[in-house]
Amino acid sequence: SGLILHPTALPSKYGIGDIGNAAFEFVNFLEATETKIWQLLPLGLTSNEEFSPYSSPSSLLGNRYLIDLNNINDYQPTSSVKEFDKNSVDFKNVYKFKDKIFYEISQNINIEDPIFFELLNDELIRSHITYLVLRDKYGLKTWTSWEKDHQEYSDNLYEKIAQNDKKLLKFHIFTQFEFFRQWAKLREYANKKQIQILGDIPIYVNHNSAD
C-alpha cells in the first residue's frame, strides 16, 4: 500500500512542512502502519507567483523552502525566530522569512570549499544556479529580455557571476547544497525502514526557467 503526502503538508512551526524531523517521524508512521510507498509531488523550486510544485524555474534544483532550519549544520534557531500558524501556509511571508535566514548563513561559506565540489562540478547544476542568480538580478523578468550575453550559459558567464555577484551566488549554492544534503539523509532513512519514495517531475517547467 502507499500514501501520497507532500512535505509541505507536514507539521512545522516555521510556516511550511519540510524534510526535517517531521518527515522522519512520518517515515516511522509509514513503517508502523506497514505502508510501503510514500508518494511525493515534485520537490523542485516553485514560481513565486503560483507556488505550484508542477510549475518550476528549474527541473533540476531543489526547493530551498523544504530545508529544515533545525538541521542546518552549525545553525541553531533562536527563541526570537518567528513561528507561523501551523494550520495554514502563507507562502510569501514564509519565503521572505526563510530567505532572510538562508542569506545570512550563506554569507559565511567559502564556495571554494571542497564540500561544494560535487554540486558545482555538475555543469547542468552550475548552469541552473547561475540562472537563479541572474533571475534575482533581473527582478524575475523573462530571460528573453536579459542582456544577450546573459541568455546562454557558459563557464565564462559563471566566472563573471562568481566575481560580480558573489553574495547571490553563495546564497544559491548554499541552499542547493543544504537541500540535497538533507534530502539524502531522509532518503537513506526511508531506505533503512524499507519505505520506497515515489517521486514526480515538474511537467509544466516555466518558459522563464533555466531549462
Question: Which role fits each region the language model picked out?
Answer:
Residues 1-211:
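Acidic/aromatic-lined carbohydrate-recognition and catalytic surfaces
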